[in-house]
């Protein structure tokens, strides 16, 4: 009975997140640019530059959203990029961008959940996630699934928000989240609950060494992270043995 209640709660929260991103899909790209002052593009380029070192041919982009990262990855000329996301409307926006750029042969978007990735074992050379890990309902289950679909020696690269270590930088970061962020958000969205969720999830996510430890406990090796923009974001790396 307890397990059934737990499963129902997980489904309910996941469904709420799905609906939230469906509602945000129309203005999502513009909101990202405004909220990060355009720095999100630099962060994605950092991930792609790291990815290029390993020259992966087949890549899975989880929580692909509107496909910003998948589109950036095209620059390193992989054979195939498959993006999955639980939000149909985010995927719809992404597909329009892909069609406009004529990337249909390289990028394929599908509706999919990281807790049950719809691919066989050892399918991908690399898996990427850009600002989606903190939305995973069952983080450990998703990481186990990622490890499963990676080929031996395949890599995982994750971009995620983190907490600046410097007190001064954290003060500025927290002030921004409490003042400027909600003002910008209210201009483009009437969903206050979405703002609260996105802000709070950024603050409570187990970043830095804590997240490194989670990756290692789930079977990844050579795990490390690199803070970006004074620690407001981190780039995580892990490898399948």
Regions found by a protein language model. Give the residues of each.
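N-terminal auxiliary segments of SAM/dcSAM-dependent transferases
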Residues: 1-18
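Conserved alpha-helix/loop element of class I SAM-dependent methyltransferases that forms part
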Residues: 37-57, 72
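Class I SAM-dependent methyltransferase SAM/SAH-binding core
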Residues: 58-116
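A short acidic, Gly/Pro-enriched loop at the edge of an enzyme's catalytic core
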Residues: 115-126
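A short glycine-rich, Lys/Arg-flanked "PGG" loop and its adjoining helix->strand segment in the class I
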Residues: 140-152
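Core SAM-dependent methyltransferase catalytic element
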Residues: 212, 218-241
């Amino acid at each position: 009975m307890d397990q059934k209640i737990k499963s129902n709660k997980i489904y309910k929260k996941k469904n709420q997140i799905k609906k939230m991103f469906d509602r945000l899909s129309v203005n999502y790209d513009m909101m990202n640019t405004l909220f990060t002052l355009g720095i999100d593009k630099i962060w994605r380029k950092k991930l792609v530059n790291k990815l290029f070192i390993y020259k992966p041919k087949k890549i899975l982009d989880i929580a692909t959203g509107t496909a910003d990262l998948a589109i950036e990855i095209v620059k390193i000329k992989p054979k195939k990029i498959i993006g999955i996301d639980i939000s149909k409307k985010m995927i719809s926006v992404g597909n329009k961008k892909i069609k406009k750029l004529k990337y249909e042969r390289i990028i394929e978007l599908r509706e999919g959940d990281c807790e049950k990735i719809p691919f066989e074992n050892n399918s991908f050379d690399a898996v990427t996630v850009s600002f989606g890990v903190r939305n995973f309902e069952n983080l450990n289950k998703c990481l186990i699934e990622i490890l499963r679909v990676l080929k031996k020696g395949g890599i995982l690269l994750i971009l995620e928000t983190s907490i600046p270590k410097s007190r001064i930088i954290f003060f500025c970061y927290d002030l921004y989240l409490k003042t400027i962020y909600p003002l910008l958000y209210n201009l483009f969205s009437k969903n206050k609950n979405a703002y609260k969720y996105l802000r709070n999830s950024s603050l409570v996510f187990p970043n830095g060494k804590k997240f490194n430890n989670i990756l290692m406990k789930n079977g990844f090796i050579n795990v490390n992270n690199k803070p970006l923009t004074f620690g407001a974001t981190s780039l995580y790396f892990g490898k399948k043995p």
